[in-house]
Each structure stands twice: as C-alpha cells, then as structure tokens.
Amino acid sequence: MSAETVNNYDYSDWYENAAPTKAPVEVIPPCDPTADEGLFHICIAAISLVVMLVLAILARRQKLSDNQRGLTGLLSPVNFLDHTQHKGLAVAVYGVLFCKLVGMVLSHHPLPFTKEVANKEFWMILALLYYPALYYPLLACGTLHNKVGYVLGSLLSWTHFGILVWQKVDCPKTPQIYKYYALFGSLPQIACLAFLSFQYPLLLFKGLQNTETANASEDLSSSYYRDYVKKILKKKKPTKISSSTSKPKLFDRLRDAVKSYIYTPEDVFRFPLKLAISVVVAFIALYQMALLLISGVLPTLHIVRRGVDENIAFLLAGFNIILSNDRQEVVRIVVYYLWCVEICYVSAVTLSCLVNLLMLMRSMVLHRSNLKGLYRGDSLNVFNCHRSIRPSRPALVCWMGFTSYQAAFLCLGMAIQTLVFFICILFAVFLIIIPILWGTNLMLFHIIGNLWPFWLTLVLAALIQHVASRFLFIRKDGGTRDLNNRGSLFLLSYILFLVNVMIGVVLGIWRVVITALFNIVHLGRLDISLLNRNVEAFDPGYRCYSHYLKIEVSQSHPVMKAFCGLLLQSSGQDGLSAQRIRDAEEGIQLVQQEKKQNKVSNAKRARAHWQLLYTLVNNPSLVGSRKHFQCQSSESFINGALSRTSKEGSKKDGSVNEPSKEAESAAASN
C-alpha cells in the first residue's frame, strides 16, 4: 500500500475541532415503593374505622357515666371555640390535610386506590372527602382525654409517620415536576406526623402520671378567663402626659413601625384555635407555593441554558437580531442573558416569600388588636362602622371556611406576586442595569433623553406651584394661616391649567401602579379590605374575616366564659356549704380565726363577683347575647352599646338593676 493510500485512511484529525460531548439529561423512571400506596390505604382505612368504633363506644360509656344524653362527642373532634385547649393536635392534622391537598392536585391519580386517568375530576371530588375522613381519627383520639384514645392515637400516628418515611426513603426521586419535588413537598407532612407521634405518647405519659386533665369541659374551669377579667378590672396606673407638643423622633417612629410587624405573646391573651390553625397552614402554604414555583420553572431554564448552541445565532438572525458576528460570542451572550433571567426569577420568588412572611406577621398583630378591641365593644374602630356582634347565617358560613380561605388567598396571592415581581425585576435588569454596565441597548435612556423638555416642564411646573404656595400664597399671622395674594393665586392656577392636565396624566398612571402593587402585596391578607370603606362588603376576603370575628367574640368572650365558670364554681360551692351545715349539726365547730378568714374571703369573692357581673352587663359586645335585647334595632346601638336616648332605654336600666340586685343578694348571702 502506497503512502498516499495510507494518508487517505488517516483519521487522526477528525476530532481536533469537535465540540465537547454534553452530558445526557437524567431521566427519572417511575418509582413504586416497597410499601404499596394502594395496599397501605386499604389497611389504614380499615384500622381507622376500627379505631373510630372503639372511640365511639368509649364516648358512649363516658356520657352514660356522666348522665349525659345526645350524640357522641366524636361528632365534634375538637372545640374550635375553646381558647384554653392544646392546639398542637388540631394544627398538625390540618397541616397534614393541606399537604395531601397539594399532592393530590398535582398528582395524576388523586385516589391511591385507582390508577385510572380518564375520570380524574370525579376521583378528585372523592379524594377531597376521603382524606379528611382518613385523618379524622388522628384528631378524634385526643377528644375524650382518655388513655385508650392516646394509645390509639400513638399507634395511628406512628403508622402514618413510619409508612411515609419508608416510602420517601425507597423513592427519593420521582418524575413529577422535579426529581426531588415529592421529597421536599412531603417535609411539612413528615414534620406534622412526627409531632403527632411525639405528642400522643406525651399525653399518655401525663395521663398515667395524673397530670393531664381528663375533663372535656375544662374550658370554663380554666384560669385563663379569670386572669383576663382580673387584668381588665385592675386599676391602671396614671400615665404621665408630657406637656411638650414635639413630634416623635425618626428613630422612635422607625422602632414603633418595626414593633408593629413583630408579634410578641401576652400572658393574658391566647389566640383562638381557628386563628392558630390558619397561621400554621398559611406558613405551610407559603412553603409549598415557593417550592412549586422554584421546582416548576428553574429546571426548565437550566435545560434551556444547557441546550444553547451555535444554531441560536441563525435563529436570532431570522428575526433580524445580530448580537455578534462570532457565533461563539452569541452563545455566550445568550447563556448570560438566560442566567440573568434565572436570577430575576429567583429574586422574584424570594421577594414574594419575604413580603408574605411580613404580611403574616403583621396580620397576627392585627388579629390580637381586633379581638381585644371587640372584647371591649369597640366595633367602630375595628369595622369602621356600627355592627352588632351576634351570630348569623353568613357569619357562620364564613367562620367555617376562614382557615381554608386564608390558605387559598395566600397561594393565589403568592403566584400573582411572583409574576408581577418577575416582570418588574426583568425590566429593571434588561432595560436599566445591563445597559448601564455594558453601555449598549440604551433604548430606554434614549427615549427619556428625547423627552427631556417635556419632563423638565412638568418638574418645573410642580416645583413652581410648591414654592409659590410655600412663600407667596400662605400667610402666617398670630399662629394662624390664611391665603395671601389671591389674585396671583388665581392667575397662576389658570396659566398652569394645561400643564396640570399633563401632570394629572402622569399621576393617574402612578396611581394605577401604586394601587395595583398595594392590592397585589396585600392579596393574601384577610384582615384588611382592598376596597373603599363604603364598598367593603364586596371584598369577599375582608367580609369573611369580619364575620369570623363576630362568631369568635360572641361565642368565646373571656368575660362571658369567666362568668359561666363562676356559676359552675358557685354550684359546686353550694354542695360544700350543705356539707358544712351537716358537719355543724353534728357538733363540728371551726376555729374563730378560720371564721374571720372565711368572712374576708367571702367579701372579696362577692366584690369580685359584683365587678364581673357589672362588666358582663355593660360590655357592648355582649349586649346581643341577652334575650330581651334581641329585638333591639340597629339604630338603638352606638358602637355596639345600647343608646341611652333610645325608647328602650328603660329596658337597659332595668337589666342593669336586676343583675345588681342579684349581685347584692349574692354578696349578702356570702
């Protein structure tokens, strides 16, 4: 073979200019865990049914032993109007339910029993009812305050927790959205089940040590309501009023503004259970939405950025976009721009998370302020109008759905916020920051530069009006202010009419932008209205919140519950007094010193009862709870209190006198 023929078969220079081989995209196959999902749900559903039957029998026996009639207490797994109970069990179960809702919506198979995709909508409806029924025993096991219930709750929570962890260890990667999305999305659910797995054994241990109260009606016997009444009846120390009229310093105002967004617990105030559940579910919703927004977009942007090659130069040339004559340079520019898009998107999601966290913290502060205001009967400052605090059909419907609405509004608001923030940051980066750094594509600056006479005219017109108003048209005389040079004022307002029209156009655009941003930022909050005060009723979120407050205040007022607790306590003391009479008849005499102490304690008790009764009668938020005030019209109430000038004023005076006589007789008897 000749040398020329050998050179023809020489392939040594084939790979000199070859492009580097790209790593193949990882393909995640479907994973079936060892603990089959369908089989597990069949078994756990049967176990849950057996647990419910056992709890029903225990509840029936407990009611018979307490001489109570009616349906079993299991129909009410938790008392949502009890502010003194342990909130952890209900909060954890609600967190598990919301995590299952997120996974169910994104899954192709909402129900674990079937793999059918054709009728997904119908299976979705069934799943919305199945999962609350499945996790119902986890909440019901803590209702009876019984050791058997705690044992069953421990077994159920351990089973759910163990199987879920087993499944995630078997299949950490799934093809759903992102390979680790299912794993990260289940972390809140794992945390809630872990809390239940720890809390039920702890309650069982307390029950065995007799440190856990076994009375289901411990709400009224709690010291929380008595402490609340003691605080409001306690004489407040007179505050020193400073004679100086100077405004607070900037540092003080900034400190107060920061404090208004930080929730600090108080000893004599406890959040209602519904609000506690809403806050925790809102935090879980915030995490789930952030995870979904990141996992659903960033992997796609990574794939697009890795797939950019020299063909992108021909694609851009088809749209008459020439970034560079060198195709490798075009690839680097496009990859850099895509990287900037990723940074903008991550910044938008981060900003949305921070804004929603800030709004949630502010909402917690306002929740407490509104509840305490309504406890005092100050409905005018809370609702901005006169409203009666009493249950109603729409109020009850809104109270039932408050927690769900809060989570839904937060999810929707976060999605819209991320989109708007992403667009704003994208425009700022590609129209302002990158052109300034690279000195190219200064289109926005060219447009602004060509219109500089127009902007200068508007600025000068606004500046002239402010300066003239400050030094020419306002006269200070003897501490008062009045208009001056009225002729010049009228002339200037006429001359600048057309210029002010153009300023009005700019201000109108700015008004639209500010209003849209404000509503978007506060979309996840229900404690403020996004509409004007006159049309607040058309804001479904604020309307739901207002009705929720009505139910909470009318049914869980601390003063009312303290009064009911004292009534129960006095009925128990009647039995003790009868026993003392029998002991006295048998010849048992008490020491004289003890008699004096009893007299002093009885006097203090009577005085406390009288103060509580007087507060109960005159509390504006409890006026609607008295039967003979149910027929009063709304015009008879001023800020929740009965008007003394109304025609029914005599009824109110009579109602005050009657409890007064009762209190005096109680004090005399004691």
UniProtKB/Swiss-Prot annotation:
Segments in the Cytoplasmic topological domain: 60-87, 143-145, 204-274, 368-401, 474-488, 527-670
Pfam families found in the cross-reference section: RBP_receptor (PF14752)
Region (Interaction with calmodulin): 600-626
Stretches with biased composition (Basic and acidic residues): 645-664
Source species: Danio rerio (Zebrafish)
Disrupted gene: phenotype observed: Morpholino knockdown causes severe defects in embryonic development, with microphthalmia, a curved body axis and heart edema. The morphant hearts do not loop normally, heart atria are strongly dilated and blood circulation is severely impaired. Morphants have an altered morphology of the craniofacial skeleton, with malformation of the first and second arches and absence of the branchial arches. Embryonic heads at 4 dpf display reduced total retinyl ester levels and reduced levels of the visual pigment 11-cis-retinal.
Annotated stretches, region: Disordered: 640-670
Protein name: Receptor for retinol uptake stra6
GO function terms (MF aspect): calmodulin binding; identical protein binding; molecular adaptor activity; retinal binding; retinol binding; retinol transmembrane transporter activity; signaling receptor activity
GO terms classed as biological process: chordate embryonic development; retinol transport; vitamin A import into cell
Residue spans, topological domain Extracellular: 1-38, 109-121, 167-182, 296-346, 423-452
Quaternary context: Homodimer. Interacts (via C-terminus) with calmodulin.
Taxonomic classification: Eukaryota, Metazoa, Chordata, Craniata, Vertebrata
